[in-house]
Amino acid sequence: VLHNLSIRDEMGDVVTSTPRPFEVHESGALLHGTKADLAVGDYLVPGRESNYEAGRIMNHVYVTRTLDAAVWGAEMAAGEGRGRIYIVEPVGELEDDPNVTDKKLPGNPTHSYRTREPVKIIGEITDWVGHSPEQLQGMRDGLADLRRRGLDVIYD
């Protein structure tokens, strides 16, 4: 069972780097970014309130293989506290996330998926580096613009 995943250099020091879009995490694991304070062995389940839209109950749990997408999830999630990135294992089948698949780019370059089944937390990445303040503000501004234009649709 994985608990904490750290990448170390030849001197044994933990290596951190800014997440890069479309780059699969070196572990190959599925990841989930959130602000929820959970423990190894807990399950993420459908039927909970959205991290991004107050009052909306989600039919799916969303996961990714890229650290960048998981970091965005952790940073943009509603709630107090620090963002967290969990290493997860789905109980059931995954499907491509239709919110990003074949949208701005063909295919599923963010390696983003969803499931209607529970997802078990098997570890946590604790040494990740977030996006710059400028990137965060750019994302917030872009989402606010979509909201103003009525285009902030989540296909769930």
Which residues does each PLM region occupy?
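Short secondary-structure boundary/capping segments within folded domains
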Residues: 20-23, 52-53
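Extended catalytic/binding region for NAD+/ADP-ribose chemistry, centered on the ART fold
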Residues: 49-79
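A short linear-motif detector with a strong N-terminal bias
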Residues: 8-12, 41, 62-68
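Active-site and NAD+-binding cores of ADP-ribose-processing enzymes
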Residues: 2-5, 12, 17, 24-28, ...
